[in-house]
Amino acid sequence: MPNQQSKYQLLKRLEQDSNLTQRQLSKELGVSLGKVNYCLQSLIQIGFIKVNNFKNSNHKTQYSYLLTPKGVAEKTKLTLMFLKVKTEEYEELKKEVEKSTNAETGK
C-alpha cells in the first residue's frame, strides 16, 4: 500500500492528466518507475483508479488512468488532511517567530 503522500501525488497528477505514462509519472514525481508501478497497482486494487487502454498515434497500446468516484473522494480527503497539517505547521512556526521577536525586543 502506498504511503499517504505518494497516493495523494499520484491521484492529483492523474486527475490533471490521465494519459501520463508510468515513466512520465516517475520523472515528474521524482520516484522510481518500480514505485510508480507498485503504487498504481495498489490504487487499482482498492478501486481508486481504473485503467483503459487505447492505441496512440504510433499505433502502440497506451494506458489511461482514470480516477473513480472513490478515488476522487480519497483525493479530496487527502487534500483536506494535508491542508490541516500545513495549517498546523504554519501556526507553530508563527508562534516560534513571535517568541523570537518578543525575546529580541525584550517583551
Residue ranges and their predicted role:
Residues 1-7, 21, 52-76:
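Short, cationic-aromatic polyanion-contact patches
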Residues 8-12:
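Pre-recognition alpha-helix immediately N-terminal to the DNA-recognition helix
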Residues 14-18:
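Short helix-to-turn junction characteristic of helix-turn-helix DNA-binding domains
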Residues 23, 34, 38:
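Key DNA-contact positions within bacterial/archaeal DNA-binding proteins
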Residues 27, 44-45:
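Alpha-helical residues within the helix-turn-helix
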Residues 73-107:
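Amphipathic alpha-helical dimerization/coiled-coil segments
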